[in-house]
């Protein structure tokens, strides 16, 4: 399931506006996918570390990286409240149909969970921490 070197499973996510989109719709050399829960302390710490990263801000501004955050759980009130504090330069979404969980499309046994994808949505890193993603981005010559 979504192993390193394989193409990531496409799925539909929903934005706060109600608009639906697919992972495959994201056009970017790299996509950081973060599965998280607002009531997870590690998730919140990770979000703060990402927000503080000057490299990430620069890569997003230069359209080298897209960040997709996905809330895979069911408490929509919690998500709607939390997502208002998410960076507007990130794609902040939830799994309205609960497809990720019901069909076990991604390993979400622990949150936060990161996947780093290339432009073709091939998995470069799977189920790693933010530090691993940052290290990869810092050490990729084409960045």
Model-based region annotation:
Residues 80-115, 119:
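Short, internal strand/loop/helix patches
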Residues 1-24, 136-139:
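N-terminal "domain-start" segment that seeds a small globular fold
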Residues 8-9, 30-31, 111-112:
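Short loop/turn microsegments at loop-to-beta-strand junctions
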Residues 21-50, 66-68:
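Short active-site neighborhood of thiol/selenol oxidoreductases, capturing the structured segment around
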Residues 12-13, 35, 116:
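Hydrophobic beta-strand positions
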Residues 5, 26-27, 60-62, 84-86, ...:
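A structural signal for short secondary-structure junctions
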Residues 118-143:
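Thiol-/selenol-based redox modules, centered on thioredoxin-like
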Residues 44-84, 98-104:
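Structural microenvironment flanking redox-active thiols in thiol-disulfide oxidoreductases
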